[in-house]
Amino acid sequence: MKNVTDSFVSLVNWPFAGSFGLNTDILATNPINLSVVLGVLIFFGKGVLSDLLDNRKLRILNSIRNSEELQRGAIERLEKARARLRKIEIEADQFRVNGYSEIEREKFNLINSTYKTLDQLENYKNETIHFEQQRAINQVRQRVFQQALQGALGTLNSCLNKELHLRTISANIGMFGAMKEITD
């Protein structure tokens, strides 16, 4: 233990080396200090700085690659969307053309069916008119016939007396009797 205490005692007895102070001579000390500090910084900082720059460079390159991949994906999606748009536009044009031709066809069919219906109605009308004319003619004929018959009956009744009537009946009976004998 004596050795340990001797060493502390010897530290106390050391002489002081000079005083601590600032050297204000710029040309004598600062360029040397600066070159030493710069040398130490360059020697030790070069590795750290190059690692930082390499990491930054890798992150930037990865970001660029990711951006390029995203750009390629976006371009592919854009091309697909444009292709779908062109396809849909073509289909829309076809629907439009087909729709117009279908409308024209339906219009033509409707006009034709309307003309056919009008022709049928015209035929029905003409048939109805003809039927009504025939009916009217038949009614007029019946009335004329009835009036002529009534007129003839009236004339016969006024012209015939009982004696003429009996003679006509007898003559007719005789004719029927002769006819009966011929047939028997």
UniProtKB/Swiss-Prot annotation:
F(1)F(0) ATP synthase produces ATP from ADP in the presence of a proton or sodium gradient. F-type ATPases consist of two structural domains, F(1) containing the extramembraneous catalytic core and F(0) containing the membrane proton channel, linked together by a central stalk and a peripheral stalk. During catalysis, ATP synthesis in the catalytic domain of F(1) is coupled via a rotary mechanism of the central stalk subunits to proton translocation. Component of the F(0) channel, it forms part of the peripheral stalk, linking F(1) to F(0). Pfam families: ATP-synt_B. CDD domains: ATP-synt_Fo_b (cd06503). It is a single-pass membrane protein. The gene is atpF. Belongs to the ATPase B chain family. The chain crosses the membrane at residues 27-49. F-type ATPases have 2 components, F(1) - the catalytic core - and F(0) - the membrane proton channel. F(1) has five subunits: alpha(3), beta(3), gamma(1), delta(1), epsilon(1). F(0) has four main subunits: a(1), b(1), b'(1) and c(10-14). The alpha and beta chains form an alternating ring which encloses part of the gamma chain. F(1) is attached to F(0) by a central stalk formed by the gamma and epsilon chains, while a peripheral stalk is formed by the delta, b and b' chains. HAMAP family: ATP_synth_b_bprime (MF_01398). This is ATP synthase subunit b, chloroplastic.
